[in-house]
């Protein structure tokens, strides 16, 4: 029963790449590690670093950052 509930939740997952910012690397199979602004499930877009398939229909594990978190990271790199 728990598995079925999780499956329904996953079926409702959606994403929209709002802005492509940077390709960090590309592997031998064409997957790219990118920095983008991505909206997940209709929420406001966040900064997102993760791997993407060549056609951007599949994604790997990644990390999302709010505007504030992204600014903290940028400031840390400047110092």
PLM-predicted stretches and their roles:
Residues 2-79:
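Positively charged, low-complexity terminal tracts
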């Amino acid at each position: 029963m728990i598995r079925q509930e999780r499956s329904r939740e996953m079926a409702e997952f959606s994403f929209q790449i709002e802005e492509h910012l940077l390709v960090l690397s590309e592997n031998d199979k064409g997957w790219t590690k990118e920095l983008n602004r991505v909206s997940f499930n209709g929420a406001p877009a966040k900064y997102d670093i993760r791997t993407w398939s060549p056609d951007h229909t599949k994604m790997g594990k990644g990390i999302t950052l709010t505007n504030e978190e992204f600014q903290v990271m940028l400031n840390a790199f400047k110092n």
